[in-house]
Amino acid sequence: MTDTAKYEKSSARCWICYEEYDKKLCSLSNDSWRRPCRCSLIAHESCLISYITRSGSTRCPQCLTAYRIAKPPKEKSWAVNVLGIGHSLEAGLAQVTFGVGSCLGITKFIYSIFKQTGIWICKQVADESSLIEMLKKPVFSSVVLPLLPCMLVRFYEAPPYDIAFSLYTHFSIYSCAEKISNTSLLLCTLPWVRSLYKELMTRIFDGIVIGADGEFEDSETDWFRQFEAQVEHRNQVEDVNEREDTESEFWILLSVAHVFLDAFTTKILRIVRPILLFPLAGKFLGRFIPGNFTKLEKSIIGAFAALVFKDIFVYGFIAWRKRKPWSIRILDNPRRVSDS
């Protein structure tokens, strides 16, 4: 065993299956011979794999040299590779198509809702003949109509530092009309008038307008916190054994209803309110405006007047709330009063 050259020339056998090494047969056989260690022990590759699988050892039993194990090379035909690539592309395209189709379906649904809402708004403030002429223009029917509800929401909020969106919509309206009229000029000046109006109201009410909506919400929150504090104080004073389950359930339902109504009014109605009420208020108040104005011009002036009346009412109510804060009373338990 010490003379390696003599061992290789005389009788080289697989140390696992004891088959003799034949160089001619080795070139014809698919099972190649391996010499993975330093002690010149050779073996078939299949025999080595079987030995490693059965014993769980990856070292030579004689010299304890660790075998170098590598993944076999992939020997697939081009047809199999093409089928694999096609299967991967099919799965990927199915996922992408489903995602894109879902997004397009949701977008189309929202777009149709906004477009129908825009048509309803135009019917409230414009004549039918002028509306038919405007709908014949592709830019107006496909771009401007879906933007009208968004324009009303932006104009209703109307921060002085963000009027680009409203200006874009207004310019789209009169560019589709292919002429500059009094109505188009009035539409273009609405954001600037709203900004000046906001600044004027701020000067008049001396700080009441600034953060009025947030202050109103804070006052409502303080009101509810005061309400909860009194309820908690009452529950602490009362004896736990004398509480009735119906009363506790009533206060829980009242708290849940208040939270739900608060979320509904502040989130949903804040968006729906200007879209629905703004055109209707303009249509109603526009009837009382004298002069040779068109229906659309009267509707715009009436809507702006409704906005002014709304702001005056809200700011006046907030000023009154500041001077006369609300107070809440929780009545005592009638049973406890009679016992005392």
Swiss-Prot record:
GO terms for biological process: positive regulation of mitochondrial fission; protein polyubiquitination; regulation of mitochondrial fission. It is a multi-pass membrane protein. One of its GO terms (cellular component) is mitochondrial outer membrane. Its main location: membrane. SMART domains: RINGv. It holds the Pfam family RINGv. Gene3D superfamilies: Zinc/RING finger domain, C3HC4 (zinc finger). InterPro entries: Znf_RING-CH (IPR011016), Znf_RING/FYVE/PHD (IPR013083). A zinc finger (RING-CH-type) spans 6-70. It comes from the Eukaryota. Keywords: Membrane, Metal-binding, Transmembrane, Transmembrane helix, Zinc, Zinc-finger. Zn(2+) 1 binds at C14, C17, H44, C47. One of its GO terms (molecular function) is zinc ion binding. Zn(2+) 2 binds at C37, C39, C60, C63. It is found in: Membrane. The chain crosses the membrane at residues 249-269, 274-294, 300-320. This is Uncharacterized RING finger protein C32F12.07c. It comes from Schizosaccharomyces pombe (strain 972 / ATCC 24843) (Fission yeast).
